[in-house]
Amino acid sequence: MSQALKHFLNLTDAGGDAIAAMLNDALDRKSARAGQPKGKADADAPLGGRVLAMVFEKNSTRTRVSFDIAMRQLGGSALILDAGTTQLGRGETIADTARVLSRMADAIMLRTDDHAKVEELARHATVPVINGLTDLSHPCQIMADLLTVIEHGKALPGLEVAWLGDGNNVLNSIVEAAGLMKFNVRIGVPEGYESDAGMIEAAVLAGAGIRVIRDPVEAVRGADVVVTDTWISMGQAHAEAKLAAMAPYQVNDALMAHAKPDAVFLHCLPAHRGEEVTDAVIDGPRSVVWDEAENRIHAQKSVLRWVFGQI
């Protein structure tokens, strides 16, 4: 593998300085194309002629659409491979898939339940590999979240972020971002549903303030940003017991009242309205989830430019 090859499997693959540069690039490029048709290429078309192979082992709306549009706006193109309709679904190895796609595409994005698969893909690919979501982390989503927070006038260093609910892959990447960008996270989570302990330890060592708090009110008190996600993933067992444990952590108006008056609400979507969040919050004035969803495009454009060595 070439020393110059860049993969984006976790936020730590880039580091804080590169993340800051990508966020600045995303802000600039988004502003520069304001009002343009969404399928129109940016004036400089920096990825002209490049092809992104998108491999999906999990269903997707936002990841699929945002990467496709991102490549179009950068002057390139994207193709979709669903595991169920390719040889991956019939037993072809990740290593062989990596070798083949490296000969046919300029970069590969994988969305999968198993983080070990994206790591194996990167080991055998000779083109950049991007994590579109795994069971461990969701770095592209957090790039969009950080971009959204900055757009709404909040500086990352010293930011107080409150997470409510399941300690999942999205939270793992928020914790990782906290260590890199020097902000704090209060994790409001019931016992037994905590996030990855290794990622928390690494973030604390890097300078983030990470606290696990059982009381949802204390987790949210004075927060600049309140974040949640779905409690039950597709096919997850023991759903009734988990829903009961999570119920006190629902983000509703009463809970949001304990955050700062100018706090914003984030959710990566899709939302299970009435479970982890109420209609009043997600549709309310402090919700920025639709900006957050759009920003998947703009953040991922900069991630793509970074893996190709343009940032």
Swiss-Prot record:
Carbamoyl phosphate binds at residues 60-63, 87, 111, 138-141, 268-269, 296. The keyword Cell cycle does not apply. The keyword Transmembrane helix does not apply. L-ornithine binds at residues 169, 229, 233-234. Its EC number is 2.1.3.3. It catalyses: carbamoyl phosphate + L-ornithine = L-citrulline + phosphate + H(+). GO terms for cellular component: cytoplasm. GO terms for molecular function: amino acid binding; ornithine carbamoyltransferase activity. Pfam families: OTCace, OTCace_N. Keywords: Amino-acid biosynthesis, Arginine biosynthesis, Cytoplasm, Transferase. GO terms for biological process: arginine biosynthetic process via ornithine; citrulline biosynthetic process; L-arginine biosynthetic process. Pathway: Amino-acid biosynthesis; L-arginine biosynthesis; L-arginine from L-ornithine and carbamoyl phosphate: step 1/3. It is found in: Cytoplasm. InterPro entries: Asp/Orn_carbamoyltranf_P-bd (IPR006132), Asp/Orn_carbamoylTrfase (IPR006130), Asp/Orn_carbamoylTrfase_sf (IPR036901), Asp_carbamoyltransf_Asp/Orn-bd (IPR006131), Orn/put_carbamltrans (IPR002292), OTCase_ArgI (IPR024904). It comes from the Bacteria. It is an enzyme of class 2 (transferase). Belongs to the aspartate/ornithine carbamoyltransferase superfamily. OTCase family. PANTHER family: ORNITHINE CARBAMOYLTRANSFERASE, MITOCHONDRIAL, ORNITHINE TRANSCARBAMYLASE, MITOCHONDRIAL. Reversibly catalyzes the transfer of the carbamoyl group from carbamoyl phosphate (CP) to the N(epsilon) atom of ornithine (ORN) to produce L-citrulline. This is Ornithine carbamoyltransferase.
